[in-house]
Amino acid sequence: MKNLSFVFIFFVLLSCKNKKQADSVEQTRTSGTVKILVDESFSSIIADQIMVFKSDYKNAEFTTIVGNENKILPTFLNDSVRVIILSRMLTPDEDKVYRSRSIVPKTSRFAIDGISLLTQKDDLDSNITVEEVISILKGTSTTGKQLVFDNAYSSTLRYFKELAQITELPKRGVYTLQSNNDVIKYVSENKNFIGVVGVNWLIANNPDMTSYIAKVKTMGVKDIKGKKGSDAYYRPDQTNLINGIYPFLRNVYIINCEGRDGLGTGFANWLMSPRGQLIVLKSGLGPHKMMSRDFNLKNTN
């Protein structure tokens, strides 16, 4: 019985020691803890960035809260979590919320994402114009094509509602599901539907989706006459994202309202650093800026 009591006391003391060590980690740009709200469209690239960051800085601990834009933004504005990944900047009213607390939001673009339009691989029609997409969103299309989005509160759907200048979806022709994976599955199994999914999500290595992705293809998109990308149909490959020629582009931002020089600031700087931008480049997205490369040319004479 005494031995059991000794073991119990030992583990209690050990847990207290570990907790004390965790609590004593200094809060700096490369150590401590931070919570980050992440738009689910960009969860893959943020997970990659955090993994590499933590491999360099062992005392950095991240808690990510992933959700659609409408879900995570209220949490950010009520001061529960002060770092957020979004596909847009704060509105003037949202910006004032933090400024009223004497905190100036720091916003940094670190990547360029494209929004892919997907159709079944055996669909003969693999191209579409921006005008056609807008007509579907307005409910005036006569082509029979239909759009499927991840969910009713996503940043992707907001993007297209703003594009078409509508506040409500038509009763027919535009539908929302529950997730990006649901969109890919649905399009792979149903003809005449066009799935709308962010490039970062589409190219993420998700083994559960391999068989479904094999049954779909990305559509080429031609922009409105007079705009860049109106001369041909372009797909959302990395070159077209970087050149800005693919019509459906969106920036990816980290917005930091920590109000101090902590891990949130360090991670924001990391995303903009050559190392962070290289991870963006390898992910298939467009980096904020192209990194120059130095070559050592040896004289062999």
Regions found by a protein language model. Give the residues of each.
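Sec-dependent bacterial lipoprotein signal peptides
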Residues: 1-14
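Exported/periplasmic ABC-transporter solute-binding proteins
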Residues: 17-55, 111, 119-301
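Early extracytoplasmic/lumenal segment of secretory-pathway proteins
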Residues: 16-106, 286
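Short, glycine-/small- and polar/acidic-enriched structural segments
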Residues: 105-108, 113-115
